[in-house]
C-alpha cells in the first residue's frame, strides 16, 4: 500500500499542497512549528477520517477558510484509488473514486496507516484508556467487522449508562428495558473481547520475535490481555456472551447504585511482560522504549497479516527519541517494504547508510518543496 499523490487545500497552515511521493522513504525536514506534523496528520486523516491530535475537526480548517480538503491517490494490490475528505464547519464528507460514501464506516479501511510519535514511547506506561484507544484504532483499520462491533458497543454502552443513572435517581424503574440494553451490550462486547484476544495473541508473537532481535536474545516479551472474562473462554464468542451476561446479572444492583456499567471490554487493558515482569512497573526506561518499538513494529506485521498489505508508516520526530541501535533496527525493519514518512529538523544523527537515498522535502511556513 502506497500514497502516491497528496493534495491539500486550506488544511491547518497549508493553503495548498500538490505533490507526489517516493514509494519508499520520504523525509520532511524543517524547523519546528513549520508544518511537518500537520502534513503527517493530513495523511493520517486521509486514512482514518479523524485526527490523532484533536477531536475538534474545525481545528483542521485553515484560519479564515470555510473548509479543508485532503485528497490522495493510493495504490493497493486491487489497483489505484482516489480518496478524498472535505471537512467543513457543518461536518465531513468522504469520497472514494469520486463517489460519495453515505457513512464514514464505508470509507475506512481503504488506506491503512500506522503512526509512531514520541508519545507512543509511553504506551507501555500510559493509561489503560490510552492502550484501549490504541488497540481499537489499529484493529478497526484491519477489520470492518471489528469497527462495526465497536461502534455498536459504544452506542449501547452510552444508552445503558444513561439509563442506569435514571434508575439510580428513581427517574425510571423498568428493569425489562435494562435487560434489553444489557443483552445487546453483552452480544457486541463478546465479539470485541473475542477479536481482541485473537489479534493480541498474534501481535504478541510478532512483538516477541522483534524484542528478541533488538536485545540479541536478552529479553522475552509477551502481551497479557486483561479482561473480566476467564482466559479459557475468550476464544468462543458465545461462551464470552454467556459469561458477560452472568457478570452483568451479579453486578446489576451495584451498577444501579453507581449509575454506570461495571462489566465489559471498556475496562480491558494490556500488560507488556518482559522477562516475566510488567515492564511498566518494573522495567528500565530502555526496556520500556524497546518494548514500545517492538509493539509498533508488530503492528506493521499484524496489519500485513490481516489485510495482505503493508500499511504506510508515519514517524513523527520519533528517530530523535531512539538511540542508534534502536533507530537502526527500526529503519532496517521497514526498508524497501514499507512506505515511510518521517519528520526531522535535521538529517544529522539519522543512520544514513540505512536511508541512503530518501526523497527529501523542505517544509517552511506551510509550504512543501523537494529539497
Swiss-Prot record:
InterPro entries per the UniProt record, alphabetical: DNA-binding_RecF (IPR001238), DNA-binding_RecF_CS (IPR018078), P-loop_NTPase (IPR027417), RecF/RecN/SMC_N (IPR003395), RecF_2 (IPR042174)
Gene3D superfamilies on file: P-loop containing nucleotide triphosphate hydrolases (3.40.50.300), RecF/RecN/SMC, N-terminal domain (1.20.1050.90)
Pfam family, one: SMC_N
One of the GO biological process terms: SOS response
Keywords for this protein: ATP-binding, Cytoplasm, DNA damage, DNA repair, DNA replication, DNA-binding, Nucleotide-binding, SOS response
Residues the record lists as binding ATP: 30-37
Localization per Swiss-Prot or TrEMBL: Cytoplasm
GO molecular function: ATP binding; single-stranded DNA binding
Entry superkingdom: Bacteria
Transmembrane segments: none
Main location: cytoplasm
Disulfide cysteine pairs (residue numbers): none
Any one of the GO CC terms: cytoplasm
Family, similarity comment: Belongs to the RecF family.
HAMAP family for this protein: RecF
NCBIfam families: recf
Known function: The RecF protein is involved in DNA metabolism; it is required for DNA replication and normal SOS inducibility. RecF binds preferentially to single-stranded, linear DNA. It also seems to bind ATP.
Descriptive protein name: DNA replication and repair protein RecF
Organism: Lacticaseibacillus paracasei (strain ATCC 334 / BCRC 17002 / CCUG 31169 / CIP 107868 / KCTC 3260 / NRRL B-441) (Lactobacillus paracasei)
Amino acid at each position: 500500500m502506497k500514497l502516491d499523490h497528496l493534495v491539500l487545500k486550506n488544511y491547518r497552515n497549508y493553503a495548498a499542497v500538490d505533490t507526489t511521493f517516493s514509494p519508499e522513504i520520504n523525509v520532511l525536514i524543517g524547523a519546528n512549528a513549520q508544518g511537518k506534523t500537520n502534513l503527517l496528520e493530513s495523511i493520517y486523516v486521509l486514512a482514518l477520517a479523524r485526527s490523532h491530535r484533536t477531536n475538534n475537526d474545525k481545528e483542521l480548517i485553515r484560519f479564515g477558510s470555510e473548509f479543508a480538503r485532503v485528497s490522495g491517490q493510493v495504490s493497493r494490490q486491487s489497483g489505484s484509488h482516489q480518496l478524498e475528505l472535505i471537512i467543513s464547519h457543518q461536518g465531513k464528507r468522504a469520497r472514494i473514486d469520486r463517489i460519495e460514501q453515505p457513512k464514514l464506516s464505508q470509507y475506512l479501511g481503504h488506506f491503512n496507516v500506522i503512526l509512531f510519535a514520541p508519545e507512543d514511547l509511553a504506551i507501555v506506561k500510559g493509561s489503560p484508556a490510552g492502550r484501549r484507544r490504541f488497540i481499537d484504532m489499529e484493529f478497526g483499520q484491519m477489520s470492518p467487522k471489528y469497527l462495526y462491533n465497536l461502534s455498536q458497543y459504544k452506542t449501547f454502552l452510552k444508552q445503558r449508562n444513561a439509563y442506569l443513572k435514571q434508575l439510580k435517581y428513581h427517574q425510571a424503574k423498568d428493569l425489562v428495558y435494562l435487560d434489553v440494553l444489557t443483552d445487546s451490550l453483552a452480544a457486541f462486547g463478546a465479539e470485541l473481547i473475542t477479536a481482541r484476544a485473537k489479534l493480541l495473541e498474534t501481535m504478541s508473537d510478532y512483538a516477541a520475535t522483534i524484542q528478541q532481535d533488538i536485545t540479541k536474545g536478552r529479553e522475552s516479551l509477551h502481551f497479557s490481555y486483561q479482561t473480566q472474562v476467564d482466559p479459557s473462554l475468550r476464544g468462543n464468542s458465545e461462551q464470552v456472551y454467556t459469561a458477560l451476561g452472568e457478570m452483568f446479572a451479579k453486578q446489576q444492583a451495584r451498577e444501579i447504585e453507581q449509575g454506570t456499567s461495571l462489566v465489559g471490554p471498556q475496562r480491558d487493558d494490556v500488560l507488556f511482560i518482559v522477562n516475566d515482569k510488567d515492564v511498566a512497573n518494573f522495567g528500565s526506561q530502555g526496556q520500556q522504549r524497546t518494548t514500545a518499538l517492538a509493539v509498533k513494529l508488530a503492528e506493521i506485521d499484524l496489519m500485513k497479516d490481516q489485510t495482505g498489505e503493508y500499511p504506510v508508516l508515519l514517524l513523527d520526530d520519533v528517530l530523535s527519541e531512539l538511540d542508534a541501535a534502536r533507530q537502526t533496527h527500526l529503519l532496517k525493519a521497514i526498508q524497501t517494504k514499507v512506505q515511510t514518512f518521517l519528520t526531522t529538523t535535521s538529517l544529522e544523527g539519522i543512520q544514513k547508510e540505512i536511508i541512503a537515498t530518501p526523497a527529501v522535502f523542505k517544509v517552511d511556513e506551510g509550504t512543501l518543496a523537494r529539497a
